[in-house]
Amino acid sequence: ILDCESTVALCCRPHGFGKSMNLSMLKCYLERPVPGSSSVNLFIGSQIWDAEDGIYRDEYARYPVIALDFSTSSYRGADVEAAMRDVVARECARLLPLLDVPDLARSDVRHIERVARGVAGSDEIDSALGVLIELLRMACDEQVVLLVDGYDAAFTNHMQAKGAYG
């Protein structure tokens, strides 16, 4: 993935083939820590850390990472839109500390704060991911990494609940 020149990489594997674990590891490696948090580099001495004389070390803890996980069982039978909005709202709350920089548009930051607190309207929630990506890009002056796990889970669970799938 780190060698990929594409802006998007889709990893399609059957259930149980390690997609979630790989995404979790990518998040741990790439994610810029929230200010004030303590972090320990778990990768020192690992293959990725030592590969090709440390070629990937500059990527460590460098990027703002949005990790959307739709694979949890709590979405079984749930409304697909509600499940997606909930996941986005939780990420807004988790990443809000990275937006504590002076040069960001206050109206956009307040937008993300409302989503994070669960008081945003439907339109605000629907646009939150795009706003969050742009704010993180500006706040961190880096590309934003978007990891999506279980992207089909909410839809599949919804269809199974209706008896229309599987």
Model-predicted regions and their roles:
Residues 1-6:
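Phosphate-binding P-loop
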Residues 7-25:
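Walker A/P-loop nucleotide-binding motif
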Residues 8-10, 65, 143-145:
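Residue-level preference for the first positions of well-ordered beta-strands
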Residues 22, 28-98:
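P-loop NTPase motor core
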Residues 22-26, 132, 154:
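Structural preference for long, well-ordered alpha-helical segments in enzyme cores
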Residues 35, 80, 126-127, 133-149, ...:
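P-loop NTPase signaling cores
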Residues 49-58, 129-139:
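Conserved alpha-helical scaffold flanking the Walker A/P-loop in AAA+ ATPase domains
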Residues 70-71, 76-126, 154-164:
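Conserved P-loop NTPase mechanochemical-coupling segment
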